[in-house]
Amino acid sequence: MPEDAAQPTGRRHEKYDRLITAAQRMPAIGMAVAHPCDTVSLESAVEAAKMGFVKPILVGPAARVRAVAKEAGLDIAGFELVSSEHSHDSAAKAVALVKAGKAEALMKGSLHTDELMAAVVARETGIRTARRISHCFIMDVPGHADALIITDAAVNIAPTLEEKVDILQNAIDLARALGAPEVRVAILSAMETVNPKVPSTVEAAALCKMADRGQITGALIDGPLALDNAISPDAAAIKHIVSPVAGRANVLLVPDLEAGNMLAKSLSFLAGADAAGIVLGARVPIVLTSRADSRSEEHT
């Protein structure tokens, strides 16, 4: 992520390409793909392997997986295939591979998200940690110089203040792992002033103070901020907001899942943004795919 978010760029996919290049410098990791029984998920795993990101371990009913590969013209001969009985079994076996240290990442195939996450958070057999599990979108928005991390738009529906602490720390850790020289977090609301009648503004103020006290680390944090004065220097100047984050945020913490999901999908479908999604807070990163995802979005 470049230092100055204020300078626009006209080059399409620039941030996406940088992310791909950075990932290709690292060794491929083993990734358990749970129930890749449709073309989209299986093709995404194959493409990610071709690009040198992962070594897929396919977990699903063997006959179905091979049939999908044959129909789609995909060569999976070099991949390990762990047979399962059904989607629930696929999720359990994929998580078991991670728990046993045989896979360093997990990917959702053609099963419901709830099925996979139930296996992830299972008390005895799952891979949860003390950290709250949350989702981040990394968005490459045309015309915006910085990649934007948006959280949480997929897992936590109406997070509490306590849960937002973990959600925020997960996003900060991700931004730093992606090489951001400075992580600048905007805690979003509909306004930039604290209003006791608007809970998200009160929580934003509390999160900022928690950061001041070292309860959240690794980033500059400001909020509440409305979306415009979080990412537009001009909008921040008009409102006379002076902070190292206003107009330059590269991480956006949304009030709830509905706001985050609409923001991320608006950027994708109206602004043509590329999106890479990841679930954090478990022992390994988890890729959740959507039926509306493009192939490039899935293997990012």
Language-model features, listed with the residues they occupy:
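Anion-binding alpha/beta catalytic cores of soluble intermediary-metabolism enzymes, centered on
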Residues: 1-57, 61-299
